[in-house]
Amino acid sequence: QMHGYFAPAIDYDGGKYGIGLLTKQLPLRLQTLPLPGREEARTLILAEFADYIYCCTHMSLTEEDRMKSLELVKAFTSSSTKPLFLAGDMNAEPESGFIKELQKDFQILSNPKQHTFPAPDPKETIDYIATLKQNAKGFAVISAKVINEPMASDHRPILVELRTAEKADKIFRMKPYLQNPVGNGITVMWETTVP
């Protein structure tokens, strides 16, 4: 079962326009944060889970608004002690001042060398997945890629696969034991919950 959430930013064409989030896990907490945008209002949705926090946003087209948004996001997330991920359309190229400022506190996990926009023939990288450096522990990036899907949106989807660390007591099913001691050596055996 999937859980869907929507944080509207503006009224649009008889409905609402904003940020959506679809999760497998049920969040412990959901919160939205309005962000500046002179061309249109912007927003961020924060979903807190047992082991991490995930934020999704769509930043302004103007650098000044993005910089103000980044300050709000940093203040909004500064008290987090869990790994925190920030994803979305940042409307900024990798060499922009905004991305350089973002990288002071966040580590980009997605591949900024792969273009994401426009979807039919991407020429720009403006979509990212990043993690707050102060809490970037307990996981490793397995892969990061842009998915070849030109029709679902005006941006290509990005995917970052992570492997989370498991505590030893969750990996080992039993205490290690000695088996078949022979000659000058022994074999230590144990059962685990991982392949």
Task: Locate each region found by the language model.
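Acidic/histidine-rich helix-loop elements
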Residues: 11, 60-62
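Structured beta-strand-rich core segments of catalytic domains in phosphoester-bond hydrolases
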Residues: 1-50, 138, 143-148
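Non-catalytic, glycine-rich low-complexity segments
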Residues: 167-195
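Conserved catalytic cores of phosphodiester-cleaving nucleases, focusing on short active-site segments
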Residues: 54
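Metal-dependent phosphoester-hydrolase catalytic domains
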Residues: 32-33, 63-67, 75-85, 91-169
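Short hydrophobic/aromatic beta-strand or adjacent loop that forms the aromatic wall/cage
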Residues: 16-19, 42-46, 123-129, 153-159, ...
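Short strand-coil-strand connectors
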Residues: 50-51, 193
